[in-house]
From Swiss-Prot:
Region of interest called Disordered, as start-end residue ranges on this chain: 48-73
Lineage: Eukaryota, Metazoa, Ecdysozoa, Arthropoda, Hexapoda
One GO CC term, this protein: chitin-based extracellular matrix
Protein name stated in the entry: Larval cuticle protein LCP-30
Function: Major cuticle protein of the integuments. May interact with both chitin and epidermal cells to form stable cuticular structures.
Length: 239
């Protein structure tokens, strides 16, 4: 790249040297000794309007020293924008102050950096195979327990409930029924319709029932049921 720039600079200087070279006036049958640049109205110009590079240097590069770097002009501090640093620490300009410590020296144990604690290595655990064990279920054999039977304490009392007598009669004006069982339960009831066709029409019932208790005693209850409700009467019923 530097060689290319040197060649370009040499060509530029050569062209500039040719432009400023002195050319003596040559004889011309038209102009003879008269300068073509002298203004003379009416004089014939051989080739008017054609560009003549010998008349000026328009468009040609002319090298000069404008813009060249000037290392030291002796005016530092006079013009604005120059760096005005200080050679001492704390002065204006923020001068760089190096360290006197030798960083290349090995400090050994005196230097204590951040300690890295290695993580514990966890070894994989191999699962222990477990063999299933069959446990037979315990069979419980049922035990028969006989129910406790309490014999009756009364004489002539038993639990037979078969019907040994039955009577039933139903009529438009009333009804009547009677039944007796093997365990000596006896019941009879009769009902009659009274005040037929009036506002006080209703049925009047009268009956009784009796049975032999566990103590061998016969208990009887007589009752009526009418417009006054159900009324029972017996020797063992409190008055």
């Amino acid at each position: 790249m530097r060689v290319f720039l040197a060649i370009c600079l040499s060509l530029t200087v050569a062209l500039a040297a040719e432009t400023g070279k002195y050319t003596p006036f040559q004889y011309n049958r038209v102009y003879s000794t008269v300068s073509p640049f002298v203004y003379k109205p009416g004089r014939y110009v051989a080739d008017p309007g054609r560009y003549d590079p010998s008349r000026d240097n328009s468009g040609r590069y002319i090298p000069d020293n404008s813009g060249a770097y000037n290392g030291d002009r002796g005016d530092r501090g006079a013009a604005g924008g120059f760096y005005t640093g200080s050679g001492t620490a704390g002065g204006p300009g923020g001068a760089y102050v190096g360290t006197k410590e030798d960083l290349s020296k090995y400090l050994g144990d005196a230097y204590k950096g951040s300690s890295i604690v290695p993580l514990p290595v966890v070894k994989p655990t191999i699962p222990v195979p477990v063999t299933p064990t069959y446990v037979a279920s315990k069979v419980v054999t049922p035990t028969y327990v006989a129910s406790k039977v309490v014999p009756p304490s009364g004489a002539g009392y038993d639990y037979k409930y078969g019907i040994i007598r039955y009577d039933n009669d139903v009529a438009p004006e009333g009804y009547h029924y009677l039944y007796e069982t093997e365990n000596k339960i006896l019941a009879e009831e009769a009902g009659k319709v009274e005040n037929i066709g009036t506002e006080n029409e209703g049925i009047k019932v009268k009956g009784f029932y009796e049975y032999v208790g566990p103590d061998g005693v016969t208990y009887r209850v007589d009752y009526t049921a009418d417009e006054n409700g159900f009324v029972a009467d017996g020797a063992h019923i409190p008055k």
